[in-house]
């Protein structure tokens, strides 16, 4: 089919080439032979009057012209997929839809397990692929490579729609045998102790509390860096180190292993976890259904959490919201905090 001189099938080939960056892989992805894909490249170059790709070994390197086309082509194909091809009514009970979700280990353990359990009852054939943070999660949303991104709202891009899930608090944790935690934690003691901290993404960027401290000119002695909050409690066992993690996750581990929760010596900000999805999924019935499930379960969990803190937590009840913090936007900070 041609539209203003362009064979629309060539857009499918172009998208595969720009996504895979390899001729063989792109041809395999759309079930074309390599000669047919090479012919498609020649026709694309002729139509756009641009080389589009150069070879570096076996890798296809996009020209600036191809880079400029990548987003619009992907969005056009996704719009056709969602608005024209997949316009049938969504039936959760019969669907075998796969949702790809980027989220932290914290949100997987304390929140998304609820989603998995509920979906197993309501839509048993629906599948999930839970992915670790990348350094550019917003770009994955734009390309339609993931369905949802779950992280603190503070670090979300304004380019995609979003909805808040629940607020969370940061607390300090340590081993119950840690004698330095037998009394209220002072800032001097906190600063002198060895810390275990979680960092995220391939670049191991700092998490929220580390960023907060750096913004205020404070620096801790970090002795161990782990790739997720769930690794902090095991590393703290039988040591005099301290860690910082979300309260709900700390309570989860407190019930399963020796862990002591203590109030931070400085007012670490609370933060709001939120969910974000590609703008072109706004009217997708499956995405709408999944968003409703996410928001309902978040509301249920927030209601369950409205209880007095445990005595050992002694959590400060004063409001400490992230949005009240002055943020230096020149600071290199990933959208992959939690």
Curated annotation (Swiss-Prot):
Residues 6-63 form the HTH lysR-type domain. It comes from the Bacteria. Residues 23-42 bind DNA. PROSITE patterns: HTH_LYSR (PS50931). Keywords: Activator, DNA-binding, Nodulation, Repressor, Transcription, Transcription regulation. InterPro entries: LysR-type_TF, LysR_subst-bd, NodD_PBP2, Tscrpt_reg_HTH_LysR, WH-like_DNA-bd_sf, WH_DNA-bd_sf. Pfam families: HTH_1, LysR_substrate. NodD regulates the expression of the nodABCFE genes which encode other nodulation proteins. NodD is also a negative regulator of its own expression. Binds flavonoids as inducers. Belongs to the LysR transcriptional regulatory family. This is Nodulation protein D. The lineage of its organism: Bacteria, Pseudomonadati, Pseudomonadota, Alphaproteobacteria, Hyphomicrobiales. The gene is nodD.
């Amino acid at each position: 089919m041609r539209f203003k001189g362009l064979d629309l099938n060539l857009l499918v080939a172009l998208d595969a080439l720009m996504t895979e960056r390899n001729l063989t892989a792109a041809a395999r992805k759309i079930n074309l032979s390599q000669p047919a894909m090479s012919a498609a490249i020649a026709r694309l170059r002729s139509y756009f009057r641009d080389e589009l790709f150069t070879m570096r070994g076996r890798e296809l390197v996009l020209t600036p012209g191809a880079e400029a086309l990548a987003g619009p082509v992907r969005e056009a194909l996704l719009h056709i997929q969602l608005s024209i091809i997949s316009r049938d009514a969504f039936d959760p009970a019969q669907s075998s839809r796969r949702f790809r979700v980027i989220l932290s280990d914290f949100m997987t353990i304390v929140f998304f397990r609820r989603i998995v359990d509920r979906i197993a009852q309501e839509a048993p054939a629906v599948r999930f692929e839970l992915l670790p943070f990348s350094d550019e999660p917003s770009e994955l949303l734009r390309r339609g490579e993931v369905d949802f991104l779950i992280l603190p709202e503070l670090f979300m891009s304004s380019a995609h729609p979003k909805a808040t899930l629940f607020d969370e608090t940061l607390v300090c944790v340590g081993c119950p045998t840690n004698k330095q935690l037998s009394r209220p934690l002072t800032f001097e003691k906190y600063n002198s102790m060895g810390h275990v901290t979680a960092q995220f993404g391939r670049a191991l960027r700092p998490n929220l509390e580390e960023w907060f401290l750096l913004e205020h000119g404070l620096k801790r002695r970090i002795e161990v860096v782990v790739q997720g909050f769930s690794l902090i409690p095991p590393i703290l066992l039988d040591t005099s180190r301290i860690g910082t993690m979300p309260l709900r996750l700390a309570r989860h581990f407190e019930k399963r292993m020796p862990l002591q929760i203590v109030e931070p010596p400085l007012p670490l900000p609370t933060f709001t976890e939120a969910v974000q999805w590609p703008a072109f999924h706004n009217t997708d019935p499956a995405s709408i259904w999944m968003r409703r499930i996410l928001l309902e379960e978040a509301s249920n969990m927030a209601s369950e959490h409205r209880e007095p803190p445990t005595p050992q937590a002694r959590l400060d009840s004063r409001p400490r919201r992230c949005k009240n913090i002055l943020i230096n936007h020149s600071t290199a900070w990933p959208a992959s905090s939690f």
